[in-house]
Amino acid sequence: KDSVFVSDLLREAKANELDATFSTTRLNHLIDKGYERITLQLDLGGESPGYLEKDKHYREADAALLNVIYPANLSKINTRRKEQVLKIVKKLAGPYGIKRYEKDNYQSANFWFNDIKTDTDQNSHAKREMSFIPSTEAEWFFDSWYAKSAAIVYKESRKEEYLNDSVQFMNRSLAQITGENMIGANGRSVPEMALPESYNYIHKSGTLHEAPSPIIPLNWSKASMTLMLKEMSNLINDEGNK
């Protein structure tokens, strides 16, 4: 699979007169370095755990690690490594969804009432950090992504725990579909039978109330659920034919 990637990239480079920059040896070296980085990060405990814990770049669990299992499907990442990813990311599961990472202030409690921009500039980041209420991170739609990833690992490992995880997170994902007369985290109505980007918290008088993000419906979350349901359907058919 990696060799196909290299040959395809070299062909495109040549077509765009960039082939002087690339070579098979160079690309294979870069691919190997990439795999070394992934395995090192996982052995250290997560996404970017090589920093001091007080460093803002330090991070163990990050939902983006699921990319290692799907859709990247990296040929040199074995089942044991994929199991590591699932165990790390599972720590981010909250009552309503999966956090991107701990202390993620984007769409955290009261985000939509604090006149905070979603921009990535330094001032916007600083304002979000100042208004962040601990343990109120947005919980994203990634349950469908996790369910599909767990199903993939179950097929490879045949370990019952991953089959159970795939069913559990599929059900969690389905529970994220909005019902009738729901109010979003910005205080406005949201459509029913729709998938939001995440579930957010509203903090009032010391109490937390969950509500769907006003970013709804989201094609990304719909696509992720579609891929999950297809994976689970295939899994059920495979199990039934045994």
Where in the sequence are the language-model features?
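CBM-like carbohydrate-recognition segments
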Residues: 131-139, 172-242
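Extended, compositionally biased non-globular segments
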Residues: 126-172
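Residue-level detector of extended alpha-helical repeat arrays and alpha-solenoid scaffolds
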Residues: 28, 65, 143, 215-218, ...
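Extended ligand-binding clefts on enzyme/binding-domain cores
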Residues: 4, 8-141, 155
